[in-house]
Amino acid sequence: MTFSRTLLLVSLAGLVGLAAGCGPRSDASRTDGAAGRIKLGFLVKQAEEPWFQYEWKGADRAAAQYGFELLKMGVPDGEKTLAAIDSLAANGAAGFVICTPDVRLGPAIVAKAKAAGMKVIAVDDRLVGADGRFLEEVPYLGMSATKIGQLSGATLATEMKRRGWAAADTAACIVTFEELDTARERTDGIIAALKAAGFPADRIYKAPQKTTDIPGSFDAANALLAQKTGVKHWLVAGMNDTATLGAVRATEGNGFKAPDVIGVGINGTDCLDELRKPAPTGFFGSIYASAPTEGFRTAEMLYLWVKEGKMPPLDTRVDGQLITRETFEQVLKAEGIL
Ligand code: FCA
């Protein structure tokens, strides 16, 4: 819009405001203050997970800095996702960041967004097409999944060595969710690092979780623990904190004491209550990646894309670092999470 047209509209709006001055505030004057304010959505699959709440916090920070309106929505399933996109369109949103509940919704999400002229950025879980390949044209920001997985596996191996456990008495329970690429890359990374550290491949067991919550990982690990008798010590890991927490709970239920379990999570946001427990549990630590940074950066990228036509990079990765009971407070304070 040209400057003079904007000026004209502003003065017209002023006249309407004046005309309505004596009566109740008109709709025109109510929206006037927000006129020109860009609206952006931020849709996440598991709003109950602290990871996503911290992502939203980061996105809120971007909204405050750049002065756009952020519409945050939880989208636990496909139906709610498509309905949320419709509602964004009806609200005049210019685009949205999404961590979809199912990556195969990719083509439907993109088609709906295109039809409404909205821009899309995928965060955490990369959209895939009908052929199972990534929708590479949709800008994506997520974890360096393989690297972060490797760090988790290397942490397990180092701590096992420090505790002096014999490989013959030890086994690894890796909770998997292989239908999701970022999850599979992480757990493959864990397994690769364990093997690289000399841990016997035939003592590494996968426990596939049906749902990506604590009950899902608890059930998966429980089924495995029931089958594998004669193990004295367990190494436990998975694609995120929730996966590891459920498996640690399963070791407890099967009679393993905290000193005989080393659990390492990923995210570093969903294990804070666990790390704060007065007595150590089998949950040793987590590979922390910055959810607020991911939320901030994706929201910022989307805003600059809408506002200035600045196309975001198509693939951006975020690294992680180990946090433990000893270090988490210091690291997370520096991150502004605590
Ligand atoms: C996936 C997981 C989340 C988080 C995110 C980065 O979406 O479900 O817990 O690890 O990747």
Language-model region placement:
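Periplasmic-binding protein-like
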Residues: 41-43, 92-101, 119-123, 173-174, ...
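Extracytoplasmic "Venus flytrap"
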Residues: 37-62, 66, 71-87, 91, ...
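Venus flytrap/periplasmic-binding-protein-like
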Residues: 121-131, 237-284, 322-323
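Hydrophobic alpha-helical segments within soluble ligand-binding/sensing domains
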Residues: 81, 140-169, 217-218, 267-272, ...
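Hinge/cleft segment of the Venus flytrap/periplasmic-binding protein
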Residues: 22-23, 36, 174-177, 182, ...
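Short, solvent-exposed amphipathic alpha-helices that sit
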Residues: 51-66, 148-152, 181-200, 216, ...
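Short, low-complexity disordered leader/linker segments with a strong preference
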Residues: 1-39, 111-118
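Structural motif
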Residues: 70-94, 207-228, 244-246, 271
